[in-house]
Amino acid sequence: MAALSLLDLARALVDIDSTTGREAEACAYLAAYLRGRGFHVTEQPVSGGRTNVVALVDPKPTVVLSTHIDCVPPFFPSSVEHGLLYGRGACDAKGALAAQVTAAERLRESGEAKVGLLFVVGEE
């Protein structure tokens, strides 16, 4: 799977309704994207059929980047105006999530493979 730009990944995530309790589609998308980019992904079961997403390159990371997948209602999709991304979760925390994925990929490409990602549900 080809890498998405930071903006495209953030926008793809913002366009998925992941208000608290409805994170399944966003988690599935994120897990598939990360697998397609060569990460070893574990979907960690949580209550109510929900999952956290753990993605590793090395089984013993020295750094783990983490944030949450869920956001508060109501859902509304993304828009980009004057170079700025708007939409539910763009700032809290899907933009940060996309930035963490992008950072992990760049670290891996530079030879620093000991980075992990942990994205959790139910923070809101």
Residue ranges, per PLM feature:
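Acidic/His- and Gly-rich active-site-bordering loop/insert found
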Residues: 1-90, 108-112
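Acidic/histidine-rich catalytic neighborhood of metal-dependent amide-processing enzymes
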Residues: 94, 98-124
